[in-house]
Amino acid sequence: MNPASVPPALPPPGQQVIHVTQDLDTDLEALFNSVMNPKPSSWRKKILPESFFKEPDSGSHSRQSSTDSSGGHAGPRLAGGAQHVRSHSSPASLQLGPGAGAAGSPAQQHAHLRQQSYDVTDELPLPPGWEMTFTATGQRYFLNHIEKITTWQDPRKAMNQSLNPMNLHPAATSTPASQRSMAVSQPNLVMNHQHQQQMAPTNLSQQNHPTQNPPAGLMSMPNALTTQQQQQQKLRLQRIQMERERIRMRQEELMRQEAALCRQLPMEAETLATVQAAVNPPAMTPDMRSITNNSSDPFLNGGPYHSREQSTDSGLGLGCYSVPTTPEDFLSNVDEMDTGENAGQTPMNINPQQTRFPDFLDCLPGTNVDLGTLESEDLIPLFNDVESALNKSEPFLTWL
């Protein structure tokens, strides 16, 4: 009995058994040969469906013989009436060929509804430079020979939108997007069209569709567009004229308001100029200067403006003092005491509103008169003048 044919005994649970093969080199060589030099196996030994080993009956499943992509030529069909699935994913399924329209089923006739919704624009002629052609599957597209573009969109729809008064600016930005979408969906068609433009323009006249030839009404489209442009220019001109009229009326209204404000001012223009030259405040308007220099009540003048009036019942205002009561001989004594070079120019440079208030205080300590330089006989008339100013019956200061 060959010990190699005896099956090895199962090891007890929990124990591992190590087998040592005698011909290890032979087994490794067989493994390398099976990997490096594989032998071809039969297709029958592989798990494949039964339809894989059957030859096709005909070529009806090819792309060229499908119903909606044959371009109107009757191709062979299957007994079950199955159509190619690839053709339904393309835009060619939206419109059938000329030869398949009569014998189409109700489901195929329903696919024509999307095309018939745009039949209103078929009566209008194409714009200048445009041409409508059809693909091999019956899908129509439009060529612009002026701008060298190809699009699925009908340019007559954009022209109808431009003729509408509410839509003066048609959506022309959809042309590049539609051109890109057409180039992505059917690149062979775009390349074929570019090749036809480079080779010979006479190939465009070989199409058998009746709308390729420009109709007689195509020559009237520039006149219609010119009329529409004239209407737009008239509307724009009317808007400009209305705006100019509103500006003119506004200017007249401003002039009337200015004249009314000038009539409401209580003082004349010459008086205002004189006061402005004398006072010359940097940030006062004419109406504020008139109220400031006028001693009457500003509300009696009838002016529409209200400003801050000067105080007439306190010592803080500028108009609360009376006529200066300094005697003439006192002023002459002051002129004799001033021995500076610019003594005569000092009263001219000082603001009159600042020198009129402290008239009798010039002889007191802390003023511009030095009492140490005066003699005793000179001080007596000064004190008398101060007493006469303080003992007046009509006081010029009102204490609150």
Swiss-Prot record:
InterPro entries, alphabetized: WW_dom, WW_dom_sf, YAP1
Required for interaction with PALS1: annotated span: 222-400
Major localisation: cytoplasm
Highest classification ranks of the organism: Eukaryota, Metazoa, Chordata, Craniata, Vertebrata
Post-translational modification: Phosphorylated by LATS2 and STK3/MST2. Phosphorylation by LATS2 results in creation of 14-3-3 binding sites, retention in the cytoplasm, and functional inactivation. Phosphorylation results in the inhibition of transcriptional coactivation through YWHAZ-mediated nuclear export. Ubiquitinated at Lys-46; leading to proteasomal degradation. Deubiquitinated and stabilized by UCHL1 at Lys-46; leading to inhibition of osteoclastogenesis.
GO annotation terms (biological process): cilium assembly; glomerulus development; heart process; hippo signaling; kidney morphogenesis; mesenchymal cell differentiation; multicellular organism growth; negative regulation of canonical Wnt signaling pathway
Claim: Membrane is one of the keywords in the record: yes
Gene: WWTR1
Role played: Transcriptional coactivator which acts as a downstream regulatory target in the Hippo signaling pathway that plays a pivotal role in organ size control and tumor suppression by restricting proliferation and promoting apoptosis. The core of this pathway is composed of a kinase cascade wherein STK3/MST2 and STK4/MST1, in complex with its regulatory protein SAV1, phosphorylates and activates LATS1/2 in complex with its regulatory protein MOB1, which in turn phosphorylates and inactivates YAP1 oncoprotein and WWTR1/TAZ. WWTR1 enhances PAX8 and NKX2-1/TTF1-dependent gene activation.
Compositionally biased tracts (Low complexity): 91-110
Protein's name according to its UniProt entry: WW domain-containing transcription regulator protein 1
SUPFAM superfamilies on file: WW domain
CDD domains: WW (cd00201)
Species the sequence originates in: Canis lupus familiaris
